[in-house]
């Protein structure tokens, strides 16, 4: 038989088993061959077509793992022999291509075998596209099953998988039809689709198992098989494709119950199998769903009532159940609302005491069912129901457990107390190791019922009705068939009219029990989803119904050779290691003795203290043996004399139903019988001896929610929903609806005019009330009276973070100079560790072990493992021995055709014959209670439009609790599906020389290299602002980056966190006497907010109660008291950039966390494309600080999205290896300067290179003045910058800052070549008359004679510049050769009047040149572009002395030139052509003390700064009491709004005031030492067209050539559009002028060649002219940015204040910065922080350095909003240094109280501690722009529940 069974499901490829089997029995060899063939066929059949997809296997859940392989299952997935159980923690997601082959077509068949453990709305699986749209999904709702075929397309089937049963089903997706196939293809429900479904699945999408999206609720249950077949027809014969383990999982295999607490569903209590009443033939009733055999000898019944107190091992003797002190509970009450938790609800529910009497074994394999001969039933049974108290047990008819049990643990009475709300599964004490001999009940004839012959004293305990709506299992007419003899049935029927059966005390008489099955293990189905209450049936009727229709079910034996007495403790105990979920284990004490003697059904309750993953994992079951002979007498029962059990007497008449208890109160009207007319209406109620009608009986009628214990005390209505009744300031609920911001105070009077630059200081944050509904945005207040333009205000507070700009270009590449002689070779850099960094870096630090990844697609089909289970000792045998079910051939290869529906291998789904209509009733019941509303899960993605869920009745709303603490900031949610990495910006044009990347980590100091030859003279750097004096320490070896610092101190102790998930209710106390439920009291008025209590510890999870029926929707509760300020919520993402709309309300600003330790510098990720400016959201009130959520890992850098919350600082990457230095290339020819290349992405910091070889001796540089030692470096490099926030509106002009300290002398640079004329400089403001004469500058080196410039157009009259420092007289320039007199050019357009240039130095008299031939009258040439500085030619021969040039106008001092990038030290190369000065590189690590540099020239004094950008609106004012409304500040970008206060007075829009007079003159700065001559400034403003100048000296000569006749001067160049004829005419003139030379000297250049070259030259010049013109006239756009905002002030068009783009280093446009320009106050350039709550600016260091160089002063505001917290103390009597905050400047200096640098504190409201929010305003004004922006705020006081603060960082404005 075993072989037959083993081959039953081999499939069609195999020969019929019986024939071969017989042969095999005769011939061993042939048998062996047959086994091989069968095995091969099995492999072939199980492997299936190569295209079939085993989803579990594809997700890495291989069966070998399920069966005990070594590989651990993923978290939240628990393997068990038949598959995997998915818990809430399960997270299985994989790319769709890893799970489904791309060749999978649109026609599919899904074959599923599963059992749900929790009622929820989870998806079993979902396939989503790369855009996160649902493409295919299967969702199980209570009572319905939805197939989603797209985001808005779904099909619903009336299939409820949440009934605790195993369901085997298939779905066919073909064309526009979806078909649900159950019952092995016998039941099909096709549903046409209204529209075409999506064509194909997105291969780049994702496959999620158990949920719809990563944040959705998880499917919790067991999954045996999930396969997808490309042939849709598979669905019609899906049973042939079910794995054998799945076919048998609910027939022979242990049920996998809900072994974990049900949060939202009913918990389970354990009950003995009612079928144990007979103890002979223990079968599983397909209609009852709670019990699951756990292992041999053990059974766990998960019933809806689980005691909340630990159940100790208690043995009960049924013989004592009928004592007079155990009156029966009126059965009607019990029957009505009690779910049947076990196969026969006989014991769980008096209505169905025997109805699950041993059903005929249900046969699952393809053998025809065989009927069991009736056997003698036993007479006793036991129902263990959770009792409220021992007294209640007595009342409820449950036996008192008084007999001591010699177990390993002291037994105590069962005192379980169902909680009225949630009850978690009871924990289980150590399993009893020994069994007591039960005392057989002695049933005298008098003790038998006169009709049924059942023992009179046999009373069936009732189960307290759970307050739930679970429909009774009886509502489903498909019940297990009970093999009740007709005569006996009639007896029972007859008795029903006079016994308690009519009252539903007893349901059916026991069926015959086969002795041969005495070792069969009772197995029941899970009753969790078989709610009671929908259909009330008498047990008798149930019995009849069960007799009529049901498939036989096979009992499960213990082990093949063991009787219960032989069962080892291992069979009956559970190892602690196997316990993972609380569960009760119920073991028959005597374990089914087969001897024909009355049995006392004693059971041991084992309370497993720890959760058991699966009790069934206690070892593989042995192979199922044949039914043994009747075993020896069973183990001793507990009660009764210890003597051996007498021989089993003939079975009584189905076990006495027990004497009727004393008349109980008249029961409620019984449920109508399933088969009307079959129940005897006879003395209805008399049989039940209904008691007086008064007491509702222990089951009490009330208690719709709680699970009343057996005593029937109605539980209170389930605790109202997740919001518990407000206890003493109950858990603060989730943040309540935004409450009003306090009672709006009276409209505040107009506040004082804000400090300059502040946009109306944000009111102090009010106490966090219940966040009010954001009020309407107040109208703009009346404009303040235009005040005098004040001093330059500090920059306004930051606006919302702007989009991050594209990566800034590297600093301006200086004009490519001629390759200079190589500079001194630097000290050899540290030797590179390796060669150039290869493509693959060295392995990073070993990451933490990730969770088990989704296994790749397994190669070979893994189904072979199924067969492998045959090798296990028990499985094949157990499955294969369904007893009479062995005939597998009836259904042919299907193997499962016999059982109706896959659902049913229990077959319950089909209507049970005559009782079909009743079955329909059952169906609604099967839906089970609508679970209480689950706790709000994370908001999932918008789910598909599912059908509306069954609305649960709304519970009585509890009074609104106080607003709960905002919960922990959620972990940064499961990272949204990582955005795709943003596109890398376009590859910039290849710049000439890229910026040197940020210096790699300083390597070990190399030997001092030989001083190289002097480098090409760089442009003189402008005098830097005085650097901070700092000793030049060698840069310390960068310490290893510590791990990212723990998140800073917890932010202020938040008020209580969100209401945590409701802890499980604690064990219910002893059930008190039942009190009447009080009426819900009137809703109390909100009390005054109490003192904020410390957050209570999270309560222990209480046991889970039964699911209460959702109460009716209550009226909205009264608005709760304002809660404590919630912890700061995470900052919402910045919205998508909109057009600059009206100022939106500020978005909620999250509570700033304490500054974390400096994180390690993260690698700069590729900058995404800049997002558009997001709308400024409303500023949320500072929430109470929640507990710090776990920091989410940094996600992939996505497309530039809205700035999200700052991610964790990434760990510092490994240092890159330093590449070997390349040989210096030969100097290239000086090329025309190309467009600035777009900056490359910032390279990662290379690893410290190895010590380099000793460099060549460099030339000794000029000795600089030693710098003071620098301050110690900041802790670590800053992490990557976040995105750039949008710039706030300009703030008002702040007061002039004090002059900065004088800078230190820098190195004297080598005189650079004469720069090209700079672009027109910005108009300076009227400078003040200098009072002091600057120190004379050092003598300038003699510059090369410049080419004569074209006459410039007259420039606008410039403002008088400051008086420059008297420069030293330069050496006279070399005398140039006289130029060739050129033809008279056309008069060019009149140039604007140029400013008076500096007087030219008298040149040496040049040699008189020969008079050239009179040139032809030249055509007026087009105005030439200003040519690039050509390479410095070799010194020519002295020319004839030229005429003295006219003194040029003194030009304005040019702006500081952009520093060129610092190039890496190369090996000493051949001296190259002098290069153009490069842009200043990023600051390297502090090197050795350099030679002291010369002082640079003092920078131009900038104009008074304009008002800074208005800052963000301050934190919300104190709750409800708006401060006096300030007068209208200058309009700026709306700050973040605080909570909506009362609308302010409408302000008048301020009229634009006239341009203010220059601000007050700042304090006289210290005259710095005379600086070096600065580099050539950028081209100054175009001067007025000057009169034609005298001929200038000829430029330096080229290499001597044959001396030619002086030619005519080239045509003047004007930046106008060339026409070809102009070019040709001009060139013709040139040709003509050179004709003489050709004739004279015999040149024979072809004219055409010359003309072509000339045209190209002119085109190049034209291009350069346009380029320079764009530089001279920037537009402030991203493509044509200005250097700083001041550049835009001098444009011809009037610019309005607003957002512009600047590029301080004038590199390529990709690194432009979006800033806010405040032209009203002098052209301030304002940088906004990334977020207003952090001092971080998304500006590269290079750009910031240039911006500092181009600025002379800076201003910034920082506001600290505080609640009962002092942040600043300064004064003689205050310990200022300890308690005052400190601000770290950009250059590392510290602003602190009492220090050298102190901020201005214009308002210090934080010193007021009155429980309201105040603010302290710090203003930083400095003439050392390098101090700004402020990069960190330190020494902030720690936060606590009543002390909080928030930062508001304003923009840093530079002028």
Curated annotation (Swiss-Prot):
Residues that bind Ca(2+): 1703, 1705, 1708, 1711
Domain called Collagen-like: residue spans: 619-673, 682-741, 751-810, 826-885, 886-945, 946-1005, 1006-1047, 1048-1105, 1108-1155, 1156-1215, 1216-1275, 1276-1330, 1334-1393, 1433-1492, 1493-1552, 1553-1612
This protein's record includes keyword Repeat: yes
Family under the similarity heading: Belongs to the fibrillar collagen family.
Entry keywords, A to Z: Calcium, Collagen, Disulfide bond, Extracellular matrix, Glycoprotein, Metal-binding, Repeat, Secreted, Signal
Keyword Endoplasmic reticulum (UniProt): no
Protein name: Collagen alpha-1(XXVII) chain
């Amino acid at each position: 038989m075993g072989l037959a069974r083993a081959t039953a499901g081999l499939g069609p490829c195999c020969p019929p088993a019986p024939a071969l089997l017989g042969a095999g029995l005769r011939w061993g060899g042939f048998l062996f061959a047959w086994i091989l063939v069968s095995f091969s066929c099995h492999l072939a059949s199980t492997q299936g077509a190569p295209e079939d997809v085993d989803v579990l296997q594809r997700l890495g859940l291989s069966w070998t793992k399920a069966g005990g392989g070594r590989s651990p299952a993923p978290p939240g997935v628990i393997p068990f022999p038949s598959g995997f159980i998915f818990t809430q923690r399960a997270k299985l997601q994989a790319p769709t291509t890893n799970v489904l082959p791309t060749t999978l077509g649109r026609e599919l068949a899904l074959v599923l075998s599963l059992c749900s453990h929790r009622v929820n709305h989870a998806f079993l699986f979902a396939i989503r596209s790369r855009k996160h749209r649902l493409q295919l999904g299967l969702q199980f709702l209570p009572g319905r099953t939805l197939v989603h075929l797209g985001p808005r397309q779904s099909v619903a089937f009336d299939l409820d998988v949440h009934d605790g049963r195993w369901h085997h089903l298939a779905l066919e997706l073909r064309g526009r039809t979806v078909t649900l196939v159950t019952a092995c293809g016998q039941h099909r429900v096709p549903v046409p689709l209204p529209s075409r479904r999506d064509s194909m699945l997105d291969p780049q999408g994702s496959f999620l198992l158990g949920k719809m999206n990563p944040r959705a609720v998880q499917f919790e249950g067991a999954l045996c098989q999930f396969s997808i077949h490309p042939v849709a027809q598979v669905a019609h014969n899906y049973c042939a494709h079910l794995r054998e383990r799945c076919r048998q999982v609910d027939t022979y295999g242990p049920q996998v119950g809900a072994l974990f607490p049900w949060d939202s569903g009913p918990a389970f209590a354990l009950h003995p199998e009612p079928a144990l009443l007979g103890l002979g033939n223990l079968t599983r009733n397909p209609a009852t769903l709670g019990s699951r055999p756990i292992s041999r000898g053990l059974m766990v019944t998960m019933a809806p009532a689980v005691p909340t107190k630990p159940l100790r091992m208690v043995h009960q003797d049924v013989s004592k159940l009928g004592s007079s002190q155990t009156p029966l509970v009126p059965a009607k009450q019990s029957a009505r609302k009690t779910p049947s938790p076990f196969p026969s609800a006989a014991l769980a529910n008096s209505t169905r005491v025997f109805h699950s009497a041993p059903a005929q074994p249900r046969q699952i394999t393809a053998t025809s069912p065989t009927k069991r001969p009736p056997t003698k039933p036993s007479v006793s049974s036991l129902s263990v129901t959770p009792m409220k108290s021992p007294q209640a047990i007595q009342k409820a008819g449950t036996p008192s457990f008084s007999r001591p049990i010699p177990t390993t643990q002291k037994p105590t009475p069962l005192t379980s107390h169902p909680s009225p709300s949630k009850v978690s599964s009871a924990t289980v004490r150590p399993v009893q190791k020994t069994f007591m001999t039960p005392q057989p009940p002695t049933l005298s004839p008098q003790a038998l019922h006169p009709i049924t012959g059942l023992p009179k004293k046999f009373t069936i305990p009732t189960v307290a009705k759970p307050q739930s709506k679970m429909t009774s299992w009886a509502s489903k007419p498909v019940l297990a068939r009970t093999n009740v003899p007709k005569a006996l049935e009639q007896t029972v029927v007859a008795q029903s009219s006079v016994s308690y059966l009519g009252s539903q005390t007893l349901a059916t008489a026991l069926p015959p029990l086969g002795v041969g099955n005495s070792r069969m293990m009772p197995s029941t189905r899970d009753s969790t989803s078989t709610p009671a209450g929908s259909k009330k049936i008498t047990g008798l009727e149930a019995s009849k119904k069960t007799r009529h229709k049901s498939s036989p079910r096979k009992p499960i034996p213990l082990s093949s050779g063991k009787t219960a007495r032989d069962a080892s403790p291992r069979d009956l105990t559970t190892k602690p290691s196997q316990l993972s979920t609380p569960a009760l284990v119920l073991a028959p004490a005597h374990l089914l003795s087969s001897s024909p003697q009355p049995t006392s059904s004693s059971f041991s309750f084992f309370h497993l203290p720890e959760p058991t993953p699966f009790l069934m994992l206690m070892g593989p079951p042995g192979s199922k043996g044949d039914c043994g002979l009747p075993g020896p007498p069973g183990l001793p029962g507990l009660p009764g004399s210890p003597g051996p059990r007498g021989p089993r007497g003939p079975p009584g008449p189905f076990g006495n139903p027990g004497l009727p208890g004393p008349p109980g109160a008249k029961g409620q009207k019984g449920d109508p019988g399933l088969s009307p007319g079959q129940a005897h209406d006879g003395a209805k109620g008399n049989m039940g001896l209904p008691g007086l009608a008064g007491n509702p009986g222990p089951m009490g009628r009330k208690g719709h929610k709680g699970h009343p214990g057996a005593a029937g005390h109605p539980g209170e209505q389930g605790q109202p929903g997740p919001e518990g009744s407000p206890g003493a300031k109950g858990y603060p609920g989730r943040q309540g609806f935004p409450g009003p911001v306090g009672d709006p105070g009276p409209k505040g009077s107009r506040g004082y005019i804000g400090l300059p630059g502040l946009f109306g200081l944000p009111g102090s944050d009010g106490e966090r009330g219940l966040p009010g509904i954001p009020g309407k945005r107040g109208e703009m207040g009346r404009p303040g009276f235009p005040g005098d333009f004040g001093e330059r205000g500090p920059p306004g507070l930051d606006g919302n973070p702007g989009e991050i700009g594209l990566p800034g270009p590297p600093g301006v590449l200086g004009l490519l100079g001629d390759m200079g002689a190589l500079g001194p070779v630097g000290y050899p850099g540290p030797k590179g560790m390796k060669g150039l960094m290869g493509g693959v870096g060295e392995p990073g630090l070993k990451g933490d072990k990730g969770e088990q990844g989704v296994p790749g697609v397994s190669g070979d089909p893994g189904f072979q493992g199924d067969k492998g289970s045959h090798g296990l000792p028990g499985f094949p045998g157990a499955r294969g021995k369904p007893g009479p079910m062995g005939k597998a051939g009836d259904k042919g290869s299907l193997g499962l055709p016999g059982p109706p529906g896959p659902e049913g291998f229990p077959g319950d789904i089909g209507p049970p014959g005559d009782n079909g209509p009743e079955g329909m009733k059952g169906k609604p019941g099967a839906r089970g209670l609508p679970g209480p509303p689950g706790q709000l899960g994370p908001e999932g993605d918008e789910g598909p439009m599912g059908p509306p869920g069954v609305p649960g009745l709304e519970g009585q709303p509890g009074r609104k609790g106080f607003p709960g603490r905002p919960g922990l900031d959620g972990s940064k949610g499961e990272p949204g599906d990582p955005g795709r990495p943003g596109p890398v910006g376009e590859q910039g044009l290849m710049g000439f020389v890229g910026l040197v990347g940020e210096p790699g980590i300083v390597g070990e100091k190399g030997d001092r290299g030989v001083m190289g030859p002097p480098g090409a003279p760089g442009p003189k750097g402008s005098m830097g602002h005085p650097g901070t004096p700092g000793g030049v320490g060698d840069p310390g070896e960068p310490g290893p980056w510590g791990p990212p610092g723990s998140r800073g101190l917890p932010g202020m102790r938040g008020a209580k966190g969100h209401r945590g998930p409701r802890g499980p209710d604690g064990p219910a106390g002893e059930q008190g006497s039942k009190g009447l439920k009080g009426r819900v009291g009137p809703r109390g008025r909100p009390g005054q907010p109490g003192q904020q209590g410390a957050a209570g510890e999270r309560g222990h999870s209480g046991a889970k109660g039964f699911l209460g029926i959702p109460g009716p929707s209550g009226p909205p509760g009264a608005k709760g008291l304002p809660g404590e300020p919630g912890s700061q919520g995470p900052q919402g993402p910045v919205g998508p950039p909109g057009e600059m709309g009206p100022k939106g309300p500020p978005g909620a600003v999250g509570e700033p966390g304490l500054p974390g330790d400096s994180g390690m510098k993260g690698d700069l990720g590729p900058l995404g494309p800049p997002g558009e400016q997001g709308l400024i959201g409303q500023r949320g009130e500072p929430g109470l600080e929640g507990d710090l959520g776990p920091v989410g890992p940094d996600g992939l850098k996505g497309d530039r999205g809205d700035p999200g919350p700052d991610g964790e600082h990434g760990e510092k990457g490994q240092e890159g290896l330093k590449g070997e230095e390349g040989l210096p290339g030969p100097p290239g020819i000086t090329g025309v300067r190309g467009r600035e290349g777009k900056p490359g992405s910032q390279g990662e910091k290379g690893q410290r290179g190895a010590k380099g070889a000793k460099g060549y001796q460099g030339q000794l540089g000029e000795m600089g003045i030693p710098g003071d030692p620098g301050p110690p470096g900041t802790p670590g490099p800053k992490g990557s910058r976040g995105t750039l926030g949008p710039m706030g509106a300009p703030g008002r002009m702040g007061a002039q800052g004090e002059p900065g300290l004088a800078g230190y002398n820098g190195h004297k640079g080598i005189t650079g070549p004469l720069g090209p004329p700079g672009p027109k400089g910005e108009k300076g403001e009227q400078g003040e008359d200098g009072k002091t004469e600057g120190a004379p500058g050092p003598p300038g080196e003699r510059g090369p004679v410049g080419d004569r410039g074209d006459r410039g157009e007259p420039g606008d009259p410039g403002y008088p510049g400051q008086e420059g420092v008297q420069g030293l007289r330069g050496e006279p320039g070399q005398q140039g050769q006289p130029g060739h007199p050129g033809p008279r050019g056309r008069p060019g357009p009149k140039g604007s009047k140029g400013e008076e240039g500096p007087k030219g130095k008298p040149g040496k008299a040049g040699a008189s040149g020969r008079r050239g031939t009179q040139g032809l009258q030249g055509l007026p040439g087009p105005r030439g572009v200003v040519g690039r500085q050509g390479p410095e030619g070799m010194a020519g021969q002295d020319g004839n002395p030229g005429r003295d040039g006219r003194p040029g106008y003194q030009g304005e001092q040019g702006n500081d030139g952009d520093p060129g990038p610092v190039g890496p030290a190369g090996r000493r190369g051949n001296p190259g052509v002098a290069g153009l000065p490069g842009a200043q590189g990023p600051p390297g690590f502090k090197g050795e003390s350099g030679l002291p540099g010369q002082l640079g020239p003092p920078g131009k004094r900038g104009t008074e700064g304009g008002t800074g950008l208005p800052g963000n609106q301050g934190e919300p004012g104190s709750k409800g009491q708006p401060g006096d409304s300030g007068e209208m500040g200058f309009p700026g970008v709306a700050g973040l709004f605080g909570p909506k206060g009362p609308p302010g007075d409408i302000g008048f829009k301020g009229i634009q005031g006239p341009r203010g007079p220059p601000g007050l003159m700042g304090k006289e700065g210290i005259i710095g030492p005379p600086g070096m001559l600065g580099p050539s400034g950028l081209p100054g403003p175009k001067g007025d067209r000057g009169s034609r100048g005298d001929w200038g000296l000829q430029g330096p000569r080229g290499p001597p050539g044959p001396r030619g006749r002086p030619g005519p001067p080239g045509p003047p160049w004007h930046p106008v559009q060339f026409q070809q004829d102009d070019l040709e005419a001009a060139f013709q003139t040139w040709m003509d002028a050179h004709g003489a030379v050709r004739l004279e000297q015999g040149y024979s250049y072809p004219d055409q060649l010359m003309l072509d070259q000339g045209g190209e030259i002119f085109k190049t010049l034209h291009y350069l002219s346009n380029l320079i013109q764009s530089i001279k006239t920037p537009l402030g756009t991203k493509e044509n940015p200005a250097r700083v905002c001041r550049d835009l002030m001098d444009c011809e068009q009037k610019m309005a204040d607003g957002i512009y783009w600047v590029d301080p280093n004038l590199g390529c446009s990709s690194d432009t910065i979006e800033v806010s320009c405040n032209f009203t106050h002098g052209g301030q350039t304002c940088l906004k922080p990334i977020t207003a709550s952090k001092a971080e600016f998304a500006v590269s260091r290079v750009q910031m350095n240039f911006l500092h160089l181009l600025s002379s002063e800076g201003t910034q505001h920082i506001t600290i909003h505080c609640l009962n917290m002092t942040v600043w103390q300064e004064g003689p009597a205050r310990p200022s240094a300890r308690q005052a905050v400190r601000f770290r400047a950009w250059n590392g200096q510290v602003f602190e109280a009492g220090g050298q640098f102190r901020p201005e504190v214009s308002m210090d409201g934080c010193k007021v501690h009155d429980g309201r929010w105040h603010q302290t305003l710090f203003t930083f004004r400095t003439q050392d722009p390098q101090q700004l922006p402020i990069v960190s705020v330190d020494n902030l006081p720690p936060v606590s529940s009543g002390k909080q603060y928030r930062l508001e960082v304003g923009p840093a404005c530079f002028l």
